[in-house]
Amino acid sequence: MNQNKPVIINGIPCYSPQVDSQHNDYPESGLKKLYELESKHFWFISRYEFIIKTITKRTNSNCRFIEIGAGTGNVSRKLMDKGFKPAVGEIHLSGLQYAKSYGITECYQFDLYNTPFSDCYDAIGLFDVLEHLDKPEKALSNINSMLRDNGLLYITVPAHMWLWNKYDRLAGHKIRYTKPSLIQVAQQANFDIIECRYFFIFITPLLWLRSKLHPDKHLEATIQEEDSEIHVNTMINKTLLAICRLENLINHLLPNIFGGSLILVVRKRANKDNI
C-alpha cells in the first residue's frame, strides 16, 4: 500500500507522479482519441450502456464507488447521470483532466500496483484495464484491499485469443481472456464470483473477420490504419449500435459461450475477524 502523501498537481492528488511518464501499459496518446469518440462510436456507447445496466442492478447510487484505470472517466460520467457520485483513479494525469471536464470532482492519480487506499469503497469498476497488465493478480489483490467486506468489483476485458489482431497490440493489450481464465484470476485474488458473461456476441463474426484481415504481424500501423480502426461510416455505426443495443436487452437470454468482451462481477470475501 502506498502510504506517501500525495503531490497536488493541477488540483489532483498524485500518489505516483513519477510513474505517469514511465508507464507503458496503456498509450497516453490514446486518451485524446477516446475523449473525442466515446460519445459517438457504437462500441463505446453500447459498452457503457451494458456496464451501467449491470452496475445499477446490484449497486445503489449512494455507495462509495471508484472507477480505476478510468481513462477519460466516460463510464463514471454516465454513472453520474444515474445519481452516483463516483471517484476516478488513473495513472495518466491527462486522463484525469478529461474526467474533471465531465464534472467529476474526486480524481486521483495512482499506480494500481501501489494503491493508496484501504477498506474504503463499496464498489469498484475496472473497465478494459486488466488486459493491459503484466501482473493482473497483484492488481486485483490491491483492489481487494481497497474494498470493504462484501464490496463488489465490476470488470470488463476483451475476450478470446482467436480474436487477437494487430490493434490489440497497438492498444497495449497483453491478453484476451476467456470466461474460465478471468474467473481464475479473480478467485486467486480472494474474490467470490457472482456473474460472468460474454457480450458483444452479435458482432463476434465481424471481430473474427477483423482478426483475419488485420493479423498481428508485429508491424507498426500507419496513421491511416489507426484512423480506419476508430472511425466508422455513419450509417454502419448507427446499424451496429442498434444491433448491440438489441443484444444488451436480451443478453441474459443468449448462450454464454463466446463474445467480443467479458463482464465479471465479483464480491470481496468478508474478513472473518470482522464477523
PLM segments and residue spans:
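Conserved S-adenosyl-L-methionine
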Residues: F191-I201
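Short, P/G- and charge-enriched loop/turn segments at secondary-structure junctions
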Residues: S39, N248-L254
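Residues lining the SAM
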Residues: F127-L130, T156
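Short, glycine-/aromatic-enriched active-site segment of Class I SAM-dependent methyltransferases
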Residues: Y35-E36, L153-I175, K179-Q187
